[in-house]
């Protein structure tokens, strides 16, 4: 739970970025050319004051490549559109789902066949906390 807003000023941390693209198919000779540096803060955090991180618990979004234990980079400044993966509170309970808006109706849709979509109806309270911008996945 986020109790209050805080100012986030990422500290630059440039890391080496090699110019070669790595084939995911057949192997090719290694290329030792350093293209420059990359700062993960710059790559992952577009709006520092509106960004927060959450760790995933559960398997309802595995079809979207989001697994138990993954780290989410969530951006509150992004517009939640139909098709966005969002962190939302439904009647005060947090959830991670794909937002679907069609015909004036709203659903939170899991990406796993064992879970049913949740249609937001009547008195149900829905608050979108933010849109998932990136997923950090470890093996």
Outline where the language-model segments fall.
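Short, positionally conserved secondary-structure boundary motifs
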Residues: 1-62, 93-94, 101, 105, ...
